[in-house]
Swiss-Prot record:
The keyword Nucleus does not apply. It catalyses: ATP + H2O + cellular proteinSide 1 = ADP + phosphate + cellular proteinSide 2. Monomer and homodimer. Part of the essential Sec protein translocation apparatus which comprises SecA, SecYEG and auxiliary proteins SecDF-YajC and YidC. Part of the Sec protein translocase complex. Interacts with the SecYEG preprotein conducting channel. Has a central role in coupling the hydrolysis of ATP to the transfer of proteins into and across the cell membrane, serving both as a receptor for the preprotein-SecB complex and as an ATP-driven molecular motor driving the stepwise translocation of polypeptide chains across the membrane. The keyword Transport applies. Its EC number is 7.4.2.8. It is found in: Cell inner membrane; Cytoplasm. GO terms for cellular component: cell envelope Sec protein transport complex; cytosol; plasma membrane. The gene is secA. It comes from Proteus mirabilis (strain HI4320). This is Protein translocase subunit SecA. HAMAP family: SecA (MF_01382).
Amino acid sequence: MLGKIVTKIFGSRNERAIRRMRKVVAQINQLEPEFEKLTDDELKAKTDEFRERLKKGEKEEDILPEAFATVREASKRVFGMRHFDVQLIGGMVLNDRCIAEMRTGEGKTLTATLPAYLNALSGKGVHVVTVNDYLAQRDAENNRPLFEFLGLSVGINLPNMAPPAKREAYNADITYGTNNEFGFDYLRDNMAFSPEERVQRKLHYALVDEVDSILIDEARTPLIISGPAEDSSELYIKMNKVIPHLVPQEKEDSDTFQGEGDYSVDEKTRQVNITERGLVKIEGLLAEAGMMKEGESLYSPANIMLMHHVTAALRAHALFTKDVDYIVKDGEVIIVDEHTGRTMQGRRWSDGLHQAVEAKEGVKIQNENQTLASITFQNYFRLYEKLAGMTGTADTEAFEFNSIYRLETIVIPTNRPMVRKDLPDLVYMNEKGKFAAIIEDIRERTKNGQPVLVGTISIEKSEEISQALTKANIHHNVLNAKFHAMEADIIANAGLPSAVTIATNMAGRGTDIVLGGSWQTEVAKLENPTEEQIEEIKAQWQKRHDAVLASGGLHIIGTERHESRRIDNQLRGRAGRQGDEGSSRFYLSMEDSLMRIFASDKVSGMMRKLGMNETEAIEHPWVTKAIANAQRKVENRNFDIRKQLLEYDDVANDQRRAIYTQRNELLDVADVSETIDSIRQDVFTSMIDNYIPPQSLEEMWDIEGLTACLQNDFDLNLPIKEWLDKEPELHEETLRERILEKSIEVYKAKEEIVSAEMMRNFEKGVMLQTLDSLWKEHLAAMDYLRQGIHLRGYAQKDPKQEYKRESFAMFANMLESLKYEVISTLSKVQVRLPEEVEELERRRREEAERLAKQQQLSHEVTKESQMSAVDGQVASGKKVGRNEPCPCGSGKKYKHCHGKLG
């Protein structure tokens, strides 16, 4: 109560922030007449003036009014567009490390030019982050004339660009690109083998467009750079034949299962659980297929890999649906983003799930991947010195932005009052009744010339609605992940009189639907249009625009509520832009996913008791409240998942930072010999400690073990026993010194053969390769630890604390292994004189020719003998990976040594 009184007197936090900024807006407006008098050259010179003032110690906040006035005046001259006062407020919010919530059509792209210009003046670079390549290119090209007029350079960071082009884009004052590409470049830079391979500068200021989509919807998706692991496609195909024999349990209500079944599906958590009956059945089926011995348990350690494949195949069949979660295109399974309805080319599910879906769909199964480097968007964007974002819908997630990213959300007032009518939800008993009502509503509205946008939550639903409209003879356009290329065209025409457009969630996001259609699109279709033609097109557009406004503006129909209120608000926000007329309504049924899984069973019970049929709808505040509560439940659960993911990833993040810092320091120095000497001393000290405990009696020494270890791990053949027999005065300390001296002596002898410079390069290469190899193994080990750590809860232990403790111990072990392996590899390397290398190369060529002849002969004999000849070439033991060290001991990768011969 007291809080409400205080808010009434002093205004909310948001209102107070806006009031404070309006004072600065007044200063900018006062500067306008003065800046209008400046010539183009004088206006351009302001950039150098601001840079000088910043160098002399002035802060960005000190020059903000003048900088914003400069951008506004330049925009008027270059684009003929003047920033509104609310856009100036938006620019200030973005400069203050906050999130600006700006409604659709309020000009977010133009607003972004203000803080981008101001923060680029320091010369440290500004990254403008968008959700897809199309928007990155569009915004960069649209704003380039303005920034170049003011003397700033603009770069675009796109996938598949060559490193020099990427470096040039990053060295620009303002760089546009997607969240994925910025994140992947960061990971790639931390896998580089020379400073020249790196493309990014220090991360200074990120301005994130559609910030809710990137920092919240995609927060659970880590960016992973991976390499191929062992091929196990045969196992996925076999498992795919087993799963269809299993029967799911029936669901009694939203939380309980009943009756017999082999597995239960929890749609809330998207998990499948095998029942006792199912376990027995699976074990029997696997034994029949010869994949497991009769009477063995699926949970035994020997079958842990089979259990992994069973779970992946079961999830693929029970939880992932074609045209909802993924599409199959050109023999490939492509993921569909659940939040935007866009396809995510190149993205793959991990833990064998993608391979299981490929087996289910009968397409070619790609190899499983092994993680080489990974980071979540949460941790990547927190690396920037300064972070800000803008979106049309952030207020519902304000708490999450604040608690995870320390970003306050400020709602920016609209330039004109919003007059869109948001009509109450209508709830039907089933989908059939809902679809009939939607079609009737569309028919009525298009009769009056009103354009309609129908929002669906999946490709499958958009196609169902499309079929129903085709049956009803209603002309319409479909915009979903399958028709990606036509997106801009369809959106440009969605505001035409009587146009009907069906769109999955937020396909076409970032493009405004203009009432009456887009006259610019019509002009673009003409070759060299005359002024008269342009004026004629504008006049026709004005007539259409006025007709659409008179019919009620754009009408939005939601066919289902999304799990998040924010996504529903985004759909509504497509109508009523810039004070235009518009309306929206959601049509729901008790068969919708959200209603079925989360909404109270009481609602459907109440509808049945009222004796409602499928054509009747219920419209009541209770129902709206039940739906809002259901959405709140899901939002809270998703927030908890993201928060928990971050808490676990923070542990890995500390280790990642330590490794990447060490790696970058290593890249930047030319000579690592001092580090190698220091590591050698540590390694030999701890290794000798294992065989000669410090301050121990000679009888406790394991001389045989020490000699063998030096020979096997460091290629040192030292007569330690002889030394001790001949020199009784040789005590522990002097023995340690002698072993170390001998190892240095042998190493220096190698260095004299090949030159110090070559040895320094080799040392650096070995350190980097060993670090990368062990980090890759460490990431896999951390992943396994993470998957099973929740079970510690049953032992009354805190899983998070256990994860921190164990991962730290693993990290410490990894660093010790790094030292040991580096010294071992450097000690074992065989150094050859040039003439010896030529002789070895001659022998290798002869061996390759002999094998080639042998293969040629094997093709000429029968199939059976051919098989035996091939079998004769297969070495026994573990298959050597292409990127592993060659077993011959050369120190080269297998693919560059004996792997070439096959």
